[in-house]
């Protein structure tokens, strides 16, 4: 299969959630998020006003992903309104925050992860349907955003698996060989 055929097959299997990265500055974090989003077959990765990122950190997975670069918070919020996105912002220190284990992670969530220093933009926090915090037990201030994004995607998938739903689709069985693709 060539790359376009692989991407088309992946598109058939994708999950409906999206990942948005708000003004991230660490190029390795962005690449790692893209690689992890690929592992969970996210529909799309939205980069909001981010700095250039290292493709090497994505281990080539960016070639198979839908990555939209949005120049600003305003442009992202306009896109979110037009598309009817269900924004779930991940932020440690926000009013009315809900813990990851108790929050609502809908099928079509757009999970937003913020800048390493300043977190998610206050305007995005205000527009979010929910603000979620990932429990921390040590004295560290926060998780790296790539780790937080991975934990959130894993929790999204775990909930579907707990409901008895197939989280990682298996290839269709080949009628001639009787095995998966």
Predicted region positions:
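Post-transcriptional modification and biogenesis factors for structured RNAs
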Residues: 1-181
């Amino acid at each position: 299969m060539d790359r376009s055929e692989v991407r088309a097959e992946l598109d058939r299997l994708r999950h409906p959630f999206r990942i948005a990265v708000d003004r991230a500055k660490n190029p390795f974090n962005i690449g790692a998020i893209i690689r992890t989003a690929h592992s969970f077959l996210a529909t799309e990765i939205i980069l909001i006003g981010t700095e250039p990122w290292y493709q090497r950190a994505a281990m080539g997975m960016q070639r198979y992903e839908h990555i939209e670069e949005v120049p600003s918070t305003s442009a992202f919020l306009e896109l979110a309104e037009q598309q009817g996105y269900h924004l779930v912002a991940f932020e440690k220190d926000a009013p009315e925050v809900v813990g990851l284990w108790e929050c609502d992670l809908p099928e079509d969530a757009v999970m937003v992860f913020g800048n390493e220093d300043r977190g998610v933009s206050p305007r995005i926090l205000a527009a979010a349907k929910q603000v979620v915090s990932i429990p921390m037990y040590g004295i560290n201030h926060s998780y790296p955003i790539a780790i937080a994004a991975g934990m959130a995607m894993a929790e999204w998938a775990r909930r579907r698996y707990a409901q008895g739903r197939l989280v990682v689709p298996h290839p269709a069985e080949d009628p001639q060989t009787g095995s998966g693709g």
